[in-house]
Amino acid sequence: MSEGEIVQVIGPVVDVKFPIDKNLPDINNALRVIKSEDESIVLEVTLELGDGVLRTIAMESTDGLRRGMKVEDTGAPISVPVGEDTLGRVFNVLGQPIDGGPAFPKDHPREGIHKEAPKYEDLTTSREILETGIKVIDLLEPYVRGGKVGLFGGAGVGKTTIIQELIHNIAQEHGGISVFTGVGERTREGNDLYFEMKASGVLSKTAMVFGQMNEPPGARMRVALTGLTLAEYFRDVEGQDVLLFIDNIFRFTQAGSEVSALLGRMPSAVGYQPTLATEMGQLQERITSTKKGSITSIQAVYVPADDYTDPAPSTTFAYLDATTNLERSLVEQGIYPAVDPLESSSSALDPEVVGQEHYEVATRVQHVLQRYHELQDIISVLGMDELSDEEKLIVARARKVQFFLSQNFFVAEQFTGVPGSYVPIKETIKGFKLILDGHLDDLPEDAFRGVGPIEDVLKKAQEMGVTPSDPEAKALLEK
C-alpha cells in the first residue's frame, strides 16, 4: 500500500505527492490522512497533476491538516456497509453510523460507492402506477413504480414536506424498503424525519444517509452515491423493490460546483462545473429498474430564484418520468400542496396506463383550469360581471377544482392541528367527476379547501349549514 504526503491544502481540496517509482493510487480511490492514533480523514482522488502529485477532495473538514502529513492509499474507493443490518440505521457519506448505535464489524459486507450503471439488456420498464394518496399527484401526474420523479420548486414552497408525506404514505401502504438520502439540506429536517419515522414504525424498513448543509462539499457530492449504493444492493442482491428518496438533488450539483474551480476546471454556464451533465448522468443512470428488482426514485430539486432555465434543474429534467412543479403563487393563496396542475406532467398519464376514465377526468380538470387561467385577465380588469353565464360556471367549477386539489398532510398535523388524509385513486377520480359534472355546484367554495375525499366536502358544507340539492350528492351524504 503506497504512502504519500500532503503538499498543499486549499479549503476542501488537498494535493498529495506520492513517490513516482511506486504505483499511484487510481482515480476515485480513498486515501487516509492519519491525524492521530484514533483520528483520520478520508480524501478521494480526483485528478492527476503529474510528477506524482494527486489532487483530492476531502470528505471531512480539513481543519488541522498541514503540509508534510502522511497519507496512505486504501487501495479501493470509499465503501459502505450494505444489507439488512443497515435498515433502521443512519449513516454519513463514509458509511459510518451517526445515530449513536453500534459500529459495524470489519468483516461486514461492504460495497464501493463508484459503480457502472446496469447494462442495457438487464433493464426493464414497468407501467404500474404507484399510488401516493395525494390527490393532485395521483390524478394529474401519476408516479410509475420503478420510475424517476422530480419535485421542483424554489425556496420554502414545500418540497421536503411532500417528500416526508410520500415517505409516510408509501412506506406504510407499500411496506417495502426505503432509502432516504439527505444531500446538503437542513439538519433539523433530517432530525425531525428520523424521530417521526421512529414513532410511526417505518424506520425498521428504512436506511438513512445524511450529508447535510454544514458538511464539506466533498461529502455533499458523494452522499447521493452512498445512498444509491445501499439501494442498489437491495435491488440487485435481494431482488427487492426499493424506494429511494433524495432531498435535494440540486445540492449535489451545487457541491460539485463549489469544488470545480478549486480543482482547476474552467466554469461553464452560470458558473456551474463543465462536467455537470456527466456527473448528473453517472448518478441518474444507476437509478433504474432491472430484471432483478426496481428502484423508484423521488428527488426534490431546488430551483434557484424560481428560474427553471437554470442549468441545474434543466439538466435533471431529462431523466425524469414525472415532474411535480411547486408554484409560489399557490402558496400565497394558501393552497397546499402548492402543486401547479398545468405545469406538472407524467409520461404515465395515458389511457393505456391509467385507464380511460382516469385519463378523461384528468384532461377535463386541466382543461377547466386552463380556461380559468385565460379568464383571469378579464376578471382582474373588468370583473366577474362581464363574463357570460357559461364562463361564470367554468370559473366557479375551476375554483372548486383548485381548492379540492389541496389536502391536509399527516406530517403537517403537528403544525396545522388538522388530521391528514390518504385518498385512494378511485375516490379521487369520483370526487373530481362529481365537481366537473355539476353535482356540487350549490356548495360553497370553502367546503372544498384542505379536505380528503369528496365525502369530507359534503360534511364540511353541512357544518356550514348548506345541504346539496343534487340527488347524487344527497345519496353520498346519506351513505
Curated annotation (Swiss-Prot):
Keywords of the record: ATP synthesis, ATP-binding, Cell membrane, CF(1), Hydrogen ion transport, Ion transport, Membrane, Nucleotide-binding, Translocase, Transport
Transmembrane segment boundaries: none
EC number per UniProt: 7.1.2.2
Catalytic activity: ATP + H2O + 4 H(+)(in) = ADP + phosphate + 5 H(+)(out)
Record-linked InterPro entries: AAA+_ATPase, ATP-synt_VA_C, ATP_synth_F1_bsu, ATPase_a/bsu_AS, ATPase_alpha/beta_chains, ATPase_F1/V1/A1_a/bsu_N, ATPase_F1/V1/A1_a/bsu_N_sf, ATPase_F1/V1/A1_a/bsu_nucl-bd
GO cellular component terms listed in the entry, alphabetical order: plasma membrane; proton-transporting ATP synthase complex
Subcellular localization, as worded in the UniProt entry: Cell membrane
Family according to the record: Belongs to the ATPase alpha/beta chains family.
Name the record gives this protein: ATP synthase subunit beta
Gene encoding the protein: atpD
